[in-house]
Regions:
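Conserved catalytic-core segment of nucleotide-activated headgroup transferases in glycan assembly
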Residues: 27, 192-259
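Nucleotide-sugar donor phosphate/pyrophosphate-binding loop at the beta->alpha transition
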Residues: 116, 125-144, 183-185
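Acidic anion/phosphate-binding donor-loop and adjacent secondary structure
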Residues: 161-165, 175-196, 211, 237, ...
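Conserved acidic donor-binding segment of nucleotide-sugar-dependent glycosyltransferases
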Residues: 204, 309-323, 332-337
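Acidic donor-binding loop of glycosyltransferase active sites
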Residues: 261-280, 293
Length: 370
């Protein structure tokens, strides 16, 4: 066992998932369980969205408004969490919102002791305000984070390149580690595409093109669609060919096992995206490919790892969200079981080679042991 103390800082929902003692996918724990087996002391703390520190709430709102950055210090700053962080040798903030929110505590701790502070990046450098005053303030906060953190783990290559270009003095801190999924959990059971049916849309982030997805389902009344999201109201889905499940990862309205079954029974997963440098749609794409369900996704500037994806070989790409183009593409592949089977097998092979959770763990271990 390695004699160091690691603390992972998560958004809400991880403790509930662990305590439920159900079978679930492990990728959104970012190798917490693997490192727990190797390090003497591995802790986790998480956001508590029920915290009601009025002062911090008001400060967060002001900082978000002025900088365009996601500060939620109210959800994480408290004495108990500070003590855990202070006793840690390595702290891993599992997204940039968390990194910004724990920043005041980390800076205070680093005045008194050495520790390694790592931040996983998912869009931190992709939201640049047009207002000069906001941009100046945002840069000030980003530079503070860049100086304080020891390592930045990018889940998308384009955002890493953008950050390296804008902040070259800190690029030695930047590392690309591909997001990887729990391939032991996401395993398909239905191999015959004649037994699969329907198109699945799933996701909640701000870069999904929800309106386009609804319009697409309305445009194809002869194909069944399933929407799993908390960002669309059921009343907006007026077509009879659409099923709706309100779902979000951290509220457990839909278990991972339920979701796996839906993937397994779907013929195609669609991921229409708005253009951004953020690697949006990543987890859904990888989960779907691991399940052998082909993915049709919008090619964006932030697509995370283009070298490992080939259009019409292990994935389907479209460059724009235009209804006629998407309808034409879906109609050309949806009824072609041989084509779907080929993409399915190639997609699963890509996951097993490049995006197993073991790969993420190995890369993370190398980084934190530097």
């Amino acid at each position: 066992m390695i004699d160091k103390k690691i603390t992972f800082v998560f958004g809400s929902g991880r403790k509930d998932k662990i305590e439920a003692e159900k079978n679930y996918a492990k990728e959104f724990f970012y190798s917490y369980f693997d490192l727990k087996k190797k390090y003497v002391d591995t802790n986790l703390i998480e956001f508590n969205d029920n915290n009601r520190n009025r002062l911090l709430i008001n400060i967060d709102r002001l900082l978000r408004k002025l900088s365009g950055l996601s500060f939620f210090t109210n959800s994480i700053i408290k004495g108990e969490n500070y003590k855990i962080l202070k006793n840690s040798d390595i702290v891993i903030a599992t997204n940039d919102r968390i990194g910004l929110s724990v920043l005041p505590m980390i800076r205070l701790i680093k005045l008194k002791k050495q520790m390694k502070f790592c931040v996983i990046v998912m869009g931190l450098f992709s939201n640049r305000p047009k207002n000069k005053s906001r941009l100046k303030l945002q840069n000030s906060f980003l530079r503070t984070l860049l100086k304080t953190a020891d390592e930045f783990i990018f889940l998308g290559k384009p955002e890493l390149m953008e950050a390296s270009d804008k902040y070259p003095a800190f690029k030695e801190k930047f590392t690309f580690i591909p997001f990887s999924i729990d391939e032991t959990f996401w395993k398909d059971q239905v191999n015959d595409f004649s037994d699969r049916e329907g198109i699945l849309f799933i996701g909640n982030d701000s870069h999904r093109d929800y309106k386009f997805s609804i319009d697409l389902a309305n445009k194809m009344p002869n194909v069944n669609f399933t929407f799993i999201t908390s960002q669309i109201r059921e009343i907006d889905l007026i077509s009879e060919n659409v099923s709706f499940i309100e779902g979000k990862w951290n509220n457990q309205t839909l278990s991972d096992e339920n979701l796996r079954e839906i993937y397994n029974n779907s013929k195609l997963v669609i991921v229409p995206l708005k253009n951004s440098l953020q690697p949006s749609g990543q987890s859904v794409t990888l989960q779907s490919m691991a399940m052998g369900t082909p993915v049709l996704i919008t090619m964006t500037d932030g697509f995370w790892d283009i070298e490992n994806y080939k259009n019409n070989e292990n994935i389907f790409f479209l460059n724009e969200n235009t209804l006629n183009e998407w309808v034409e593409k879906i109609e050309s592949i949806y009824y072609d079981s041989n084509k779907l089977k080929k993409i399915s097998e190639s997609g699963k092979s890509t996951i097993m080679k490049e995006y197993k959770i073991e790969n993420f763990t190995n890369n993370l271990e190398k980084l934190i042991s530097k």
